């Protein structure tokens, strides 16, 4: 892991040369007294051809730095580290290395300057790595080196924080790579398949500007992550109010500002202020929505009242128009009612008269010799019988009058 972290640094090629020189000088000073000297991974073998190596590197993008993805599964073997180091260096870097080999005094001067710069930077102590962790890491590296590079998932916050530490904070003893059982390949033995694999790894890795920065710890970190920013896209344009826009902008501003503040007490005060203002805005939004709902209901009621009033006016006009017809129908009804009563009375009279005549016929059949006697009760019958007599008398008078006129003319 130390070898992988030693390659993750940003800056210009000059800064990389100074840090590499610092690591090499520190390793030489610390291991001067040791008899068995380790073979440096970054030293080129004598059998390699520099011109062919430069031609291969010119095909790559110049001044391209290798930066592995920020997650715990990105473990590389020393072979892959060596290939990444060779591919990430430019021809100008190789020429700088050759010039350093020719001028050792300049190398020592640059090494002293880099040592002074690194001494000014704060360092933190690292926990020693046990042999068991070394063996497990070697096994993991062997298994990972066989597999094809796959698309990496975004890193978690703890892994990003642990892997994003710069090499300037590490001691010089942790920068030196460990030996493995694999032989050290040269730059000439690098095959096109390895180059294509390296290109795919470079394409997969995210750009440094797009990496997620870990949030600073605070008491309200969980609350800030679970806060819901209002989405105005789902609402209609007529439903969006000024308070919705204000609340959305206020939440975004709070999240951006809280990330920039480092003090925990300030974060707590900002969070309290934010929650109070947010509560007030939400309460105002609810009241405005209730007011809008009441206004809608009031508008509906008023429209219904207007419709009913208009209907009432129409009915009144229709009643006024139909009132004469009602009077005519009333008179017709009264007339028909009178005729109905008269018909009932005449029907009753005829039925009684028929019954009387039937009784008279029965009496005459029983006693035909008996004389008829008339009293007051039989007056209607006498009048009915005298109608023919009175008619004959009137007829005779008319004949007598006409005869008198004829006699006077003669």
UniProtKB/Swiss-Prot annotation:
One of its GO terms (biological process) is chordate embryonic development. Keywords: Centromere, Chromosome, Coiled coil, Cytoplasm, Isopeptide bond, Kinetochore, Nucleus, Phosphoprotein, Repressor, Transcription, Transcription regulation, Ubl conjugation. The keyword Transcription regulation applies. Residues 101-115 have a biased composition (Polar residues). There is a cross-link at residue 179 (Glycyl lysine isopeptide (Lys-Gly) (interchain with G-Cter in SUMO2)). It is found in: Cytoplasm; Nucleus; Chromosome, Centromere, Kinetochore. Expressed at high levels in glioblastoma cell lines. Up-regulated in GBM (glioblastoma multiforme) tumors. Significantly increased in both the tumor core as well as the contralateral striatum and cortex in gliomas. Residues 138-149 have a biased composition (Basic and acidic residues). The keyword Repressor applies. Residues 1-72, 87-228 are annotated as: Disordered. Phosphorylated by PLK1 at Thr-73, creating a self-tethering site that specifically interacts with the polo-box domain of PLK1. The modification Phosphoserine is found at residues 105, 110, 114, 130, 133, 135, 186, 224. Residues 28-38, 200-218 have a biased composition (Basic residues). The modification Phosphothreonine is found at residues 73, 191. One of its GO terms (cellular component) is nucleus. Component of the CENPA-NAC complex, at least composed of CENPA, CENPC, CENPH, CENPM, CENPN, CENPT and CENPU. The CENPA-NAC complex interacts with the CENPA-CAD complex, composed of CENPI, CENPK, CENPL, CENPO, CENPP, CENPQ, CENPR and CENPS. Interacts with MLF1. Belongs to the CENP-U/AME1 family. Component of the CENPA-NAC (nucleosome-associated) complex, a complex that plays a central role in assembly of kinetochore proteins, mitotic progression and chromosome segregation. The CENPA-NAC complex recruits the CENPA-CAD (nucleosome distal) complex and may be involved in incorporation of newly synthesized CENPA into centromeres. Plays an important role in the correct PLK1 localization to the mitotic kinetochores. A scaffold protein responsible for the initial recruitment and maintenance of the kinetochore PLK1 population until its degradation. Involved in transcriptional repression. This is Centromere protein U. It comes from Rattus norvegicus. The gene is Cenpu.
């Amino acid at each position: 892991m130390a070898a992988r972290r030693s390659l993750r640094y940003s800056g210009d090629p000059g800064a990389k040369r100074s840090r590499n020189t610092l690591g090499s000088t520190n390793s030489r000073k610390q291991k001067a007294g040791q008899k068995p000297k380790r073979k440096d991974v970054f030293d080129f073998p004598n059998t390699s051809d520099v011109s062919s190596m430069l031609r291969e590197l010119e095909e790559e993008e110049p001044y391209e730095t290798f930066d592995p993805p920020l997650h715990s599964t990105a473990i590389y073997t020393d072979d892959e580290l060596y290939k990444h180091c060779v591919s990430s260096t430019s021809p100008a870097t190789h020429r700088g290395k050759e010039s350093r080999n020719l001028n050792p005094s300049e190398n020592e001067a640059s090494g002293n300057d880099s040592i002074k710069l690194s001494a000014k930077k704060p360092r933190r102590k690292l926990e020693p790595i046990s042999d068991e962790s070394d063996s497990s890491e070697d096994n993991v590296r062997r298994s990972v080196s066989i597999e094809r590079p796959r698309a990496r998932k975004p890193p978690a916050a703890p892994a990003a924080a642990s892997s994003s530490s710069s090499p300037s904070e590490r001691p010089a003893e942790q920068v030196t790579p460990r030996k493995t059982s694999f032989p050290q390949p040269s730059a000439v033995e690098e095959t096109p398949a390895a180059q294509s694999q390296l290109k795919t790894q470079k394409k997969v890795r995210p750009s440094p500007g797009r990496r997620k920065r870990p949030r600073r710890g605070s008491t309200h970190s969980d609350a800030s992550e679970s806060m819901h920013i209002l989405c105005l896209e789902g609402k209609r344009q007529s439903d969006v109010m000024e308070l919705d826009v204000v609340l959305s902008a206020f939440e975004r501003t709070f999240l951006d500002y809280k990330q920039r503040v480092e003090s925990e007490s300030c974060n707590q005060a900002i969070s309290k202020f934010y929650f109070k203002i947010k509560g007030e805005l939400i309460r105002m939004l609810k009241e405005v929505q209730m007011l809008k709902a009441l206004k809608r209901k009031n508008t509906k009621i008023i429209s219904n009242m207007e419709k009913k009033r208009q209907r009432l006016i129409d009915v009144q006009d229709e009643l006024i128009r139909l009132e004469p017809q009602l009077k005519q129908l009333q008179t017709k009804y009264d007339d028909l009612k009178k005729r109905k009563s008269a018909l009932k009375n005449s029907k009753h009279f005829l039925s009684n008269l028929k019954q009387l005549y039937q009784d008279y016929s029965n009496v005459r059949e029983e006693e035909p010799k008996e004389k008829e006697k008339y009293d007051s009760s039989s007056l209607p019958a006498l009048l009915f019988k005298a109608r023919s007599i009175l008619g004959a008398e009137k007829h005779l008078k008319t004949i007598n009058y006409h005869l008198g006129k004829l006699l006077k003319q003669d």
